[in-house]
């Protein structure tokens, strides 16, 4: 009897950590505006053109992604916003870059988030700026209220086939290829066989980590690190997508893609069919041309393979523009 109890205790001690990690909740934010508050919210981790801060509580892992190369690079702003489910807009001044950040959040239909502002910022002017955008219902809070509200949030989990856009990839000696990203839909388990798009290569998930802890399974919207077999980090680009091998939702396009089209009222130029633009879809940034069907319908012609699903939001960018660099938005048909 004692031996049986000891065996049960040993088994419990082995299994409980895995069970706890499997059941860990995940909530992911983007911080735009003044991102100095990030260090008060979490510990700085992965840093490239994006910095990712994280914090683990008893049952939840929080992450905050910051586009540290913005405003110099509009691309990092678009990628950071597409990684998260919730947004924090921290305003210390009203200028054209704030306008771009509002346009970025609006372009991907952000509807849940929080706004903080310094004493010098006129709240009424700020509310006027965000009027008629998807962030018009964001809550205005101070720092203490923000922390309270974040602790009450629920994860935005999506069931279905696995969709995991990759935001970082690198080789680790003795481990092999490691990819980082947020599971946008579905789940991933150790030894799952997945496909990476747009290349179509088959990969094997060797191991999984959340917040540097090993786990055997994780679900949307977990931020994870996967050790994988079947692809080298040098062959992976940011925005490549890991998915179920028999994915029905994701498509890879090299030809024209029909899409809705709304030109930004803040862009004063004309969009021409012979001009090359940059499209932001998920966390992909790819060169494209456009062809008009009518005033609110276009065809997007990618110059490189583009991964997408029907109904996905996109933003059209002109990175070298002196004014606003987010020049249009729409929904892929």
Q: Model-found features: residue ranges?
A:
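C-terminal effector/interaction modules appended to NTPase cores
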Residues: 2-86, 91-92, 183-190, 194-333
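Charged, alpha-helix-enriched surfaces in structured cytosolic catalytic cores
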Residues: 36, 96, 100, 161, ...
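Conserved C-terminal guanine-recognition region of P-loop GTPase G domains, centered on the G4
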Residues: 74-137
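Helical mechanochemical/support elements of P-loop NTPase systems and associated helical scaffolds
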Residues: 97-101, 122, 142, 184-187, ...
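Conserved, well-folded catalytic cores of nucleic-acid-processing
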Residues: 104, 108, 129-133, 169-172, ...
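Signal for well-folded cores of large energy- and translation-related assemblies
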Residues: 106, 151-154, 171, 184, ...
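Canonical P-loop GTPase G-domain recognition
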Residues: 114, 118-173
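Short catalytic-site patches enriched in acidic/histidine residues
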Residues: 164-185, 208
């Amino acid at each position: 009897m004692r031996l049986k109890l000891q065996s049960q205790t040993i088994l419990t001690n082995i299994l409980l950590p895995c069970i706890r990690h499997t059941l860990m909740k995940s909530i992911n934010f983007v911080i735009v505006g003044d991102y100095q508050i990030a260090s008060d919210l979490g510990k700085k981790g992965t840093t490239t053109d994006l910095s990712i801060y994280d914090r683990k509580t008893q049952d939840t892992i929080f992450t905050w992604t910051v586009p540290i190369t913005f405003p110099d690079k509009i691309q990092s702003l678009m990628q950071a916003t597409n990684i998260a489910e919730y947004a924090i807009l921290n305003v210390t001044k009203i200028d054209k870059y704030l306008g771009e950040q509002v346009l970025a959040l609006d372009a991907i239909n952000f509807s849940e988030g929080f706004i903080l502002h310094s004493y010098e910022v006129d709240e009424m002017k700020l509310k006027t700026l965000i009027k008629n955008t998807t962030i018009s219902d964001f809550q205005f809070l101070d720092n203490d209220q923000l922390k309270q509200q974040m602790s009450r949030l629920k994860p935005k989990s999506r069931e279905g086939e696995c969709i995991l856009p990759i935001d970082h990839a690198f080789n680790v000696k003795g481990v092999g290829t490691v990819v980082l990203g947020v599971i946008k839909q579905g789940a991933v388990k150790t030894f799952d066989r997945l496909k990476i798009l747009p290349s179509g290569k088959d990969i094997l998930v060797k191991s999984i980590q959340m917040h540097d802890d090993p786990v055997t399974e994780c679900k949307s919207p977990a931020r994870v690190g996967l050790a994988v077999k079947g692809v080298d980090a040098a062959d992976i680009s940011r925005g490549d997508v890991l998915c179920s091998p028999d994915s029905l939702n994701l498509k890879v396009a090299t030809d024209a893609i029909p899409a809705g089209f709304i030109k930004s009222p803040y862009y004063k130029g004309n969009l021409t069919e012979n001009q090359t633009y940059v499209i932001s879809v998920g966390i992909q940034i790819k060169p494209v041309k456009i062809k008009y069907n009518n005033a609110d319908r276009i065809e997007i012609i990618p110059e490189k393979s583009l991964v997408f699903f029907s109904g996905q939001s996109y933003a059209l960018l002109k990175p070298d523009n002196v004014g606003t660099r987010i020049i249009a938005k729409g929904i892929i048909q």
